[in-house]
Amino acid sequence: ITVRRALSELEEAGQIYRVQGKGAFVKSQKLSTKLSALTSLTEDMRELNVPCGSRILALETIPAGSKVAKKLHIDENTPVVMLKRLRLAGDSPLAIETCYLHPRVGPTVCQYIADDVSLYAVLWEKCGVCPVYAEQSLEIGLLQPWEQRMLGENAPVYAMFTTRQAFDAEHSPIEYVEGKYRADRYSYHISMTSQHISARQKN
């Protein structure tokens, strides 16, 4: 078998991709997590035996816009901590997450958050709060040029956009997060049950 034929077979199998003028590259394994429980990305990656890291891109206090204020149940222009991070799976960029923290936890998070530190661990260990319920949405969106560059060479122009509004046991908002995940490297697995079947089983 020739090298050219071997590369063609690997490309057809979806194991490599080619870039004109640069050569052939190994495709990263797609990571899939179950969307059935409230977990952090760190926990999801641990379940997959993949090291999870983060790089802080921005950490600042800003006035809450109308959308963020509504999600956090606070008045517009209330100071909130905005944490923007590049999330890593192993050494490879996976997502850009922008988190807006409720004023009751934001200042404490600022003191303890750092690269490769779990936000949920800081919330529990330093703030004494734990997200127990969340509303999450998924859609496909177009990355800005700087976001595409940040997510690595050959990152697709489209990404999976997520939003999450997390609450504590008292149903008070803790955070509102907007994530942009590489669609070629990350996916969600969702299990569903028919309500009609459940109703028949009860009768």
Predicted ranges, named:
Residues 1-26:
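N-terminal helix-turn-helix
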Residues 28-203:
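All-alpha effector-binding/dimerization core of bacterial HTH-type transcriptional repressors
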